[in-house]
Amino acid sequence: MSEPSPPLRVLRRDPVCAGPAAGRLAVLVHGSMDRATSFTRLMARLPDWTIIAYDRRGYAGSSGTGPPLGFDQQVADLMEVLDNTQAVAFGHSFGGDVVLAGAASHPELIPTALVWEPPLPWLPWWPETTASRGAGAGLDPDDRAEWFMRRMVGDRVWERLPSATRVQRRAEGHTLQAELRSLSLGAVFDAAAVRIPVIVGRGGKSSVHQRRAGRELAAALPAGIMAEIADAGHGAHLSHPAEVAALLRQAAARA
């Protein structure tokens, strides 16, 4: 009998003040090469909410769970975190794919959602130069993780990270490889099957393909609408947490 995998690291923040959304629960799902703590600024803008965020399998505090075995395991992990409790869901980047797939299969637990620029590499026009279409696949996992991080945060930020942090991030390369591979096998969700209200967010400073994908995804979702933060890029939850929080409140109101 195989040993059970260790549990995912889950962060829970109870409301810190009274407000109109008292009792509202949100679950936050991070993207590739990220972790739950990247939502700290966003959580601070939702003081009257209960917030659950978790390190996805293979990252940060969940590194001991190992790389995901497939995309279905990502959805299963989200359902395990929810534990049969209904929540408004926010998914950033790859986390948006997880949220949409989860909403398609378990709309009773995710009644409404906000997703920010989820990759859609199964679309025929999706650029070959993106990681989700295989760019960097020839690198060793550790090197691909560093390559990915440098593309996301820039060389200067990467080189200023503490040595221990860079070692940890490089070690997450096997997880990155596994989840990017899962996106290369075909669509991980059927937009037509996502019947819940969804706000598809995009940044005014994001890449052309991310902006196009946001528009097309919002149109393909039965109850999808698009929202844009003009001065934001892909990392809007870090650069514009107040605006993302406002969109999450708007998503909750659509439930």
PLM regions: where:
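Catalytic histidine-centered segment of alpha/beta-hydrolase-like enzymes
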Residues: I229-A242
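Conserved HGGG/HGGXW glycine-rich cap/lid loop of the alpha/beta-hydrolase fold
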Residues: P6-G64
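Glycine-rich His-Gly loop
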Residues: L28-G31, S93, G203
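Active-site loop/turn elements of alpha/beta-hydrolase fold enzymes
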Residues: Y54-G58, P118, D231
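Gly/Ala-rich beta-loop-alpha elbow adjacent to hydrolase catalytic centers
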Residues: G91, G95, V99
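Active-site loop/oxyanion-hole signature of alpha/beta-hydrolase fold enzymes
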Residues: R41-A44, T50-F90, A246
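Conserved serine/cysteine hydrolase catalytic core
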Residues: T165-A220, I225-E228
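Flexible "cap/lid" loop of the alpha/beta hydrolase fold
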Residues: L100-L139
